[in-house]
From Swiss-Prot:
It comes from the Eukaryota. Residues 52-63 have a biased composition (Basic and acidic residues). This is Small heat shock protein, chloroplastic. Residues 1-23, 51-80 are annotated as: Disordered. One of its GO terms (biological process) is response to heat. Residues 126-235 form the sHSP domain. It comes from Solanum lycopersicum (Tomato). CDD domains: ACD_sHsps-like. InterPro entries: A-crystallin/Hsp20_dom, HSP20-like_chaperone, HSP21-like. Induction: By high temperature but not by drought or anaerobic conditions.
C-alpha cells in the first residue's frame, strides 16, 4: 500500500511518498508539486549560490547579467520611486501560488498574531509564550530581515536569486531510505519555491543570505534617503 501526503506552506510544498511494498506490483506514486508558471525576462539577475563544504555558513552573492550574452558584471539600476511593496496578481488570485509579496506575508503574520492573542493556546511553541511560524519578516528603516524554516535542507539544496524585481527562493531535497524489511522502502521529497516582489528602495547587489541549522536568513539593505530640511519663515 502506498500513500502520498501534500502539505502547503509559504514556501509552497512539502511532498512525501513512502511505505511502498513490492507486493503492490511495484507501483509508486510520483512526487507532485504545486506551481504557477512565471514570466522571466532576460534582464539583470543576481544569484546567491551555496558554496563550500556541508557546514551551514553564509551564502556568497554573485552578480551576473544575461543581456546580449555578456557575462560581465554590470551595475544594478536602482530607481527609488516605488517605496511600497507591490502586490502580485498571481499571489492574490491563487492562494497556492509560489508568487508572494512581502506585504502579503507581513499581513499574514499580523493575522496569526491577532488569532493567537484571541485564542491564547493557539500557534504557540510548547512551554513558551512565543509565536513560531515557518517564516518571519521585519521591515525597518535601514533593512528588511527575513527568516524561512527549511528543515532537512543544507545550503547545497537552497538557491536564492533576484530576477528583475523578484526575490526567488528555491529549495529541493530528495532522500531514499531502506525499509525495515526487504520488501519495503521509502522516499522523502521536500520542495520549496516562493517569489517576493521587492520595492525599489533596496540595494539588490548587497543582499545577503545565510543558512543555519535548517533556517534561512536573508538581509536586504535599503538605499539611503537624503532628508531635506526646509526652514519655514514665521511672519
Amino acid at each position: 500500500m502506498a500513500y502520498t501526503s501534500l502539505t502547503s506552506s509559504p514556501l509552497v510544498s512539502n511532498v512525501s511518498v513512502g511505505g511502498t511494498s513490492k507486493i503492490n506490483n511495484n507501483k509508486v506514486s510520483a512526487p507532485c508539486s504545486v506551481f504557477v508558471p512565471s514570466m522571466r525576462r532576460p534582464t539583470t539577475r543576481l544569484v546567491a549560490r551555496a558554496t563550500g563544504d556541508n557546514k551551514d555558513t553564509s551564502v556568497d552573492v554573485h552578480h551576473s547579467s544575461a543581456q546580449g550574452g555578456n557575462n560581465q558584471g554590470t551595475a544594478v539600476e536602482r530607481r527609488p520611486t516605488r517605496m511600497a511593496l507591490d502586490v502580485s496578481p498571481f499571489g492574490v488570485l491563487d492562494p497556492m501560488s509560489p508568487m508572494r509579496t512581502m506585504r502579503q506575508m507581513i499581513d499574514t503574520m499580523d493575522r496569526l498574531f491577532e488569532d493567537t492573542m484571541t485564542f491564547p493556546g493557539r500557534n504557540r511553541a510548547s512551554g513558551t509564550g512565543e509565536i513560531r511560524t515557518p517564516w518571519d519578516i521585519h521591515d525597518d528603516e535601514n533593512e528588511i530581515k527575513m527568516r524561512f524554516d527549511m528543515p532537512g535542507l543544507s545550503k547545497e539544496d537552497v538557491k536564492v536569486s533576484v530576477e528583475n524585481d523578484m526575490l526567488v527562493i528555491k529549495g529541493e531535497h530528495k532522500k531514499e531510505e531502506d525499509g525495515r524489511d526487504k520488501h519495503s522502502w521509502g522516499r522523502n521529497y521536500s520542495s520549496y519555491d516562493t517569489r517576493l516582489s521587492l520595492p525599489d528602495n533596496v540595494v539588490k547587489d548587497k543582499i545577503k543570505a545565510e543558512l543555519k541549522n535548517g533556517v534561512l536568513f536573508i538581509s536586504i539593505p535599503k538605499t539611503e534617503v537624503e532628508k531635506k530640511v526646509i526652514d519655514v519663515q514665521i511672519n
